[in-house]
Amino acid sequence: MRSGLSWRNWAAAGLFVLVAGPGQSQPTGGERAMLTRLEAGQWELRGGSANARIAAICLGNPILLTQPRHGAAPCTRDVVAADASSMTVNYSCPGLGRGRTTIRFETPRLVQIDSQGLDHGRPFVLRAEARRVGQCAGA
């Protein structure tokens, strides 16, 4: 597996803060076909050769799964391919970086994420399984 940074460094740095906040853009067009079927709540991302836990996230707006290294940053997105079972998005976050992410739908509680791009000028590659594991704390 290719990797620009280790999974442990990602988790330690807290780069997966994916809680939708006010002003976040909502899914439109081809994004809706798959993303509207995902359940909000507590999700866990696992990946790497040991299937290690990368992060736990409270997912409100599923579109944020398309920009995993840039969290809830205000980014522009271009859907380059989408159907009922997968989507590929190019995104750009001014001053932070950009990426290309493919999400493959398995169930409303399980998706596969494949993302790569630049984060503050440094390349990254992420391949992870995202699984809903319950309600968000305080929900």
Name each region found by the language model:
Residues W43-G47, M87-P94, I103, I113-D119:
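Short beta-strand segments that buttress and anchor functional surface loops
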